[in-house]
Amino acid sequence: MKQRGVTVWLTGLSGAGKSTITEALQAKLIAEGYSIEVLDGDIVRTNLTKGLGFSKEDRDENIRRIGFVSNLLTRHGVIVLVSAISPYREIREEVRGKIGNFVEVFVNAPLSVCEDRDVKGLYKRARAGEIKSFTGIDDPYEPPFNPEVECRTDLETLEESVAKVWNKLTELGYIHQAVAV
């Protein structure tokens, strides 16, 4: 199947549901025969961006590197799913401009919901002062102004969130089958 490459960039707070949506979308795309790659922020940090810290400069460099790899894959017709907090609007826009075929998905859940979902205990540690510069606690998260898709994971099911992304990819001509929301 001939497909157009695109980077689907899922951004949001830790615990908002980025990885969950990415995994479900990945399974659906593979089942439909699409060539895809996933760049998960946690995995990228232990490999591609090892050694970077959590200063604004290091976070921006982390996103630039993810964007660079995404751009290479996208140019070769791959659907790239990026799941990364990517807290700063300016660097997300920079990466969007370089990649071109880019769909921003704002995975939106209130901080209180993300803290309730805190399976890794990161928010608890950040509130206790054990983790500094934690996004949403003592470092800002800048929501996108105009994402192509917004998934309110506190108000909708996983299936509804996946359908929103799927339908947007269909509408933009990256995939060829819509799913009812």
Swiss-Prot record:
Alphabetized InterPro entries for the sequence: APS_kinase, P-loop_NTPase, Sulf_AdTrans/APS_kinase
Q: Name one GO cellular component term.
A: cytoplasm
Keyword Membrane assigned to the entry: answer is no
Matching entries from SUPFAM superfamilies are given as:
P-loop containing nucleoside triphosphate hydrolases
Which molecular function GO terms apply here?
A: adenylylsulfate kinase activity; ATP binding; sulfate adenylyltransferase (ATP) activity
UniProt binding sites for ATP? 12-19
Task: Name the domain of life this protein comes from.
Answer: Bacteria
One Pfam entry for this protein is APS_kinase
Active-site residues, as the UniProt record annotates them = 86
Enumerate the UniProt keywords alphabetically. ATP-binding, Kinase, Nucleotide-binding, Phosphoprotein, Transferase
EC no.? Answer: 2.7.1.25
This molecule's function is given as:
Catalyzes the synthesis of activated sulfate.
User: What does the sequence similarity comment in the record state about its family?
Assistant: Belongs to the APS kinase family.
- Stated name of the protein: Adenylyl-sulfate kinase
The gene behind this protein is cysC
